Amino acid sequence: DCLATTVMYKKKFSKEKFKVFHPGGNIGNSLLLAEDIMVTRNKMPTINYKKNLNAALKEMNKKKLGIVVILKNKHIKGLVTDGDLRRESKNFSKNEDLRKFMTQKPMVVNESMPASKALAIMNEKQITSLLVVSDNHLKKTNKILKGIIHIHFLLKHGIK
């Protein structure tokens, strides 16, 4: 271990290089960030806030993450989960305004959050997905969605 550490120091081999050159190892996995694991762009289940519940269900089924993010001009307005809909299944019509069912302030993390911390948040809050925003949008009220992390992505990467 001493020899390996000395060589790493002399060669200026940082933890970040470990992440690049040895991504499947324990050190590489421990350095993964939210932005390394999230889905982006056309893989994200999103819908305009003016759409109805039927359109949201179609998007949710198409993207298969169990959620749909409600957007207004690219800004996060809320989130609807398959669990939200199951709990209300006897009380809605597919033509209803989906804002009636949405969580208005969903859990949001920044892109540079360690993936292991994202998993800890999911476990603590008993949720399966987190919305990811850029570091400079985290404290803003109008957050722009950058990606989505699902708990299965974290487990697939061996995050603990």
Regions found by a protein language model. Give the residues of each.
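The conserved cystathionine-beta-synthase
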Residues: T46-K64, S89, K100, V108-H137, ...
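Phosphate-binding active sites in nucleotide-utilizing proteins
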Residues: N61-K62, G66-N73, G78-R87, N91-Q104, ...
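Bateman (tandem CBS) regulatory domains
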Residues: S30-M44, N95-P106
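Cyclic nucleotide-binding regulatory module and flanking cytosolic helices
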Residues: S14-M38
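Short alpha-helices
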Residues: D1-K12
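Phosphate-coordinating loops and pocket residues in cytosolic domains that bind phosphorylated ligands
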Residues: V20, V39, R87, N91, ...
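Short, conserved, surface-exposed binding loops centered on an aromatic residue
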Residues: G28, D36-M38, Y49, K58-K62, ...
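Structural motif
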Residues: T5, K43-P45, G66-V68, K77-L79, ...
